[in-house]
Amino acid sequence: MVTIAIMAQALVVEQSRTVPVTVADAFSGTVPMPLNELFCRWYGPIPPIKAVRDQTGIWDAVGQTRTILLQGGGSMAETLTSFNEPHSFGYTLSDITGPMAALISGVNGEWLFQPAGTGTKITWRWTLHRRSAATAPLLPAFGRLWKGYAGRSLEHLSDLLVG
């Protein structure tokens, strides 16, 4: 399922996929996964993650931060804002550099894990905050691009979780 909603200052996009594993296994398999393993391919102009820096311990405590480095340059600071095992976790992306910085000032992200039949529906949601009024008309195009990126990423996550 794909949803796109435009708010005055932001665009909400989400993508979902049902995976044949339990909610607990989906959550515990997703949270600690190295980002450069999950997000390892280009999708149009959206680059793969090259590396994660400055993370201490496992990613499970609200307030933790890390720096995400992108292929081809660019980076962003990620802060864990919610952690409700095994149902959801949320984060913000800020201090965005590289090509996305011209369009987006920040992102609120959320991963949701819900029972679905004998598996788990995993939903990945981004709220994109525009850089300026001038870039606002470009957000829907980026949102459509992001949903393709998210769909492919969730497909890859499914493959990794099912093994």
Where do the protein language model's features map onto the residues?
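Hydrophobic pocket/interface hotspot
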Residues: A26-T30, R66, L80, Y91, ...
